[in-house]
Amino acid sequence: MLSIRKEEELLRVIYEDDALLVVNKPAGLVCHPTKTDCLSSLVARLRIYQGYCPLRMGPGDCIYSPDGSCPWNVEETDTVPLVNLINRLDRETSGVVLTTKNYEAARVMGKLMREGKIKKTYQAIVKGVPEPAAGLIDQPLGDDEESQVVVKDCVRPDGTPARTAYRLVRSFERDGVTYSLLDVFPDTGRKHQIRIHLAWIGCPVVGDKLYGGDERYYLDLVEGRLTAEQRRRLILPWHALHARCLTYTTWDGQTRRFECEPEPWFREFAGM
């Protein structure tokens, strides 16, 4: 019998109303469902939070609960709730994810996102110090045809336009190595954009297994071969990228801002 899990382990809710549900996605959680278990993705957890319990094997039989009830304090439903992610984050990236509960909200928010009217602020811990201390990286991205990793992209002149602004918050040292805390402002939303652009200027995100300089770390991770020594060299448990804030202006001129702090391991390493 699996142990009952607490509701606070299900979702970290930043804001909720009848149309929107904004959450703080933890590092290590994928956004979309996988074939492993019903808690392994953000979408599955959002459905459970809204009352749909896929843990139930039959009437009065929930695999996580000895008495057959859903282990979270939710009003149960047999209908799979609508879950639409307006923005998505990589598995190891933590932070703000904006989701909608109905089709009209999905249409409105999706339009704002496509038009670039939802502004995103990230925080990253990188190796080294960027020069200049603030700037705009305007470099197109496309498939990395020389990589063994199918999902890996790179800066290439025939790629899709991508722009990332950054600003140095401060630099600091750990064990004789210099790191920097950056505020990062992506103007476009390409796959792995921030990680690629920061690596391209010589400041890879700390803990990045794919763009940190040796993609064998990523291959060993997905193939279950990542050793304790490799994890030690990566320094942090996940790559140090956090979606700090989403901001947009509503049709009637009101500014909406959703924000959350980085996880404790991130804050501790950066001295925040």
Question: What is each model feature region?
Answer:
Residues 182-185:
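Short histidine-centered loop motifs in beta-beta connectors
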Residues 41-45, 193, 200:
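Short amphipathic alpha-helical face segments that pack within enzyme cores
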Residues 1-163, 170-175, 255, 261-271:
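RNA pseudouridine synthases
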Residues 1-20, 26-30, 174-176, 197-272:
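Pseudouridine synthases involved in rRNA/tRNA modification
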Residues 27, 187-188:
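Active-site acidic-Proline motif in GNAT/NAT acetyltransferases
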Residues 109, 180, 190-198:
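Short beta-strand segments enriched for Tyr within beta-sheet-rich domains
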Residues 88, 165, 243-245:
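Extracellular/lumenal ectodomain signal focusing on beta-strand-rich modules
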